Protein backbone atom coordinates (compact mmCIF):
# COMPACT_ATOMS: atom_id res chain seq x y z
CA UNK A 1 0.00 0.00 0.00
CA UNK A 2 1.12 3.52 -0.67
CA UNK A 3 0.90 6.51 1.63
CA UNK A 4 -2.55 7.64 2.70
CA UNK A 5 -3.84 11.11 1.89
CA UNK A 6 -3.51 12.10 5.56
CA UNK A 7 0.13 11.02 5.66
CA UNK A 8 0.88 12.93 2.47
CA UNK A 9 -0.87 16.00 3.84
CA UNK A 10 1.22 15.92 7.01
CA UNK A 11 4.44 15.58 5.03
CA UNK A 12 3.48 18.42 2.69
CA UNK A 13 2.50 20.66 5.61
CA UNK A 14 5.77 19.96 7.41
CA UNK A 15 8.08 20.62 4.44
CA UNK A 16 6.14 23.23 2.42
CA UNK A 17 7.69 26.63 1.95
CA UNK A 18 4.29 28.34 1.69
CA UNK A 19 0.75 27.29 2.61
CA UNK A 20 -0.12 26.08 -0.90
CA UNK A 21 3.29 24.62 -1.77
CA UNK A 22 3.16 21.05 -3.04
CA UNK A 23 5.78 21.05 -5.78
CA UNK A 24 8.96 22.42 -4.23
CA UNK A 25 11.95 20.09 -4.23
CA UNK A 26 11.76 19.83 -0.43
CA UNK A 27 8.20 18.50 -0.53
CA UNK A 28 8.92 16.14 -3.41
CA UNK A 29 12.01 14.72 -1.69
CA UNK A 30 10.12 14.30 1.60
CA UNK A 31 7.29 12.41 -0.15
CA UNK A 32 9.75 10.21 -2.03
CA UNK A 33 11.61 9.49 1.21
CA UNK A 34 8.39 8.37 2.89
CA UNK A 35 7.57 6.07 -0.05
CA UNK A 36 11.12 4.66 -0.04
CA UNK A 37 10.92 3.95 3.70
CA UNK A 38 7.55 2.25 3.22
CA UNK A 39 8.92 0.05 0.44
CA UNK A 40 12.03 -0.80 2.46
CA UNK A 41 9.78 -2.24 5.13
CA UNK A 42 7.97 -4.24 2.46
CA UNK A 43 11.25 -5.79 1.30
CA UNK A 44 12.09 -6.97 4.80
CA UNK A 45 9.09 -9.27 4.51
CA UNK A 46 9.12 -9.98 0.75
CA UNK A 47 12.74 -10.53 -0.22
CA UNK A 48 11.98 -11.98 -3.66
CA UNK A 49 9.80 -9.10 -4.90
CA UNK A 50 12.15 -8.01 -7.67
CA UNK A 51 9.52 -6.14 -9.64
CA UNK A 52 8.84 -3.74 -6.76
CA UNK A 53 12.58 -3.45 -6.11
CA UNK A 54 12.96 -2.02 -9.61
CA UNK A 55 10.36 0.62 -8.73
CA UNK A 56 12.23 1.37 -5.52
CA UNK A 57 15.43 1.98 -7.46
CA UNK A 58 13.58 4.43 -9.72
CA UNK A 59 12.29 6.31 -6.66
CA UNK A 60 15.78 6.48 -5.17
CA UNK A 61 17.15 7.78 -8.47
CA UNK A 62 14.43 10.41 -8.73
CA UNK A 63 15.10 11.55 -5.15
CA UNK A 64 18.85 11.73 -5.87
CA UNK A 65 18.22 13.94 -8.93
CA UNK A 66 16.00 16.29 -6.93
CA UNK A 67 18.59 16.49 -4.15
CA UNK A 68 21.33 17.25 -6.69
CA UNK A 69 19.18 20.00 -8.18
CA UNK A 70 18.51 21.53 -4.78
CA UNK A 71 22.20 21.29 -3.87
CA UNK A 72 23.11 23.21 -7.04
CA UNK A 73 20.45 25.90 -6.62
CA UNK A 74 20.40 26.52 -2.85
CA UNK A 75 22.94 24.70 -0.72
CA UNK A 76 21.50 25.84 2.61
CA UNK A 77 18.02 24.50 1.81
CA UNK A 78 19.67 21.24 0.75
CA UNK A 79 21.59 20.94 4.02
CA UNK A 80 18.48 21.74 6.08
CA UNK A 81 16.46 19.14 4.19
CA UNK A 82 18.90 16.27 4.55
CA UNK A 83 19.24 17.08 8.25
CA UNK A 84 15.44 17.12 8.74
CA UNK A 85 14.94 13.86 6.85
CA UNK A 86 17.95 12.13 8.35
CA UNK A 87 19.58 11.49 4.98
CA UNK A 88 23.32 11.31 4.60
CA UNK A 89 25.17 13.72 2.34
Swiss-Prot record:
The lineage of its organism: Bacteria, Pseudomonadati, Pseudomonadota, Gammaproteobacteria, Chromatiales. Part of the 30S ribosomal subunit. Forms a bridge to the 50S subunit in the 70S ribosome, contacting the 23S rRNA. The keyword Ribosomal protein applies. InterPro entries: Ribosomal_uS15, Ribosomal_uS15_bac-type, uS15_NS1_RNA-bd_sf. This is Small ribosomal subunit protein uS15. One of its GO terms (cellular component) is cytosolic small ribosomal subunit. GO terms for biological process: translation. Keywords: Ribonucleoprotein, Ribosomal protein, RNA-binding, rRNA-binding. One of its GO terms (molecular function) is structural constituent of ribosome. Belongs to the universal ribosomal protein uS15 family. Residues 1-25 are annotated as: Disordered. One of the primary rRNA binding proteins, it binds directly to 16S rRNA where it helps nucleate assembly of the platform of the 30S subunit by binding and bridging several RNA helices of the 16S rRNA. Forms an intersubunit bridge (bridge B4) with the 23S rRNA of the 50S subunit in the ribosome. PANTHER family: RIBOSOMAL PROTEIN S15, BACTERIAL AND ORGANELLAR (PTHR23321), SMALL RIBOSOMAL SUBUNIT PROTEIN US15M (PTHR23321:SF26).
Amino acid sequence: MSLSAEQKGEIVKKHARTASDTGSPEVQVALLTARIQHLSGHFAEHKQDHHSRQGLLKLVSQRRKLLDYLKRKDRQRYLDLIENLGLRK
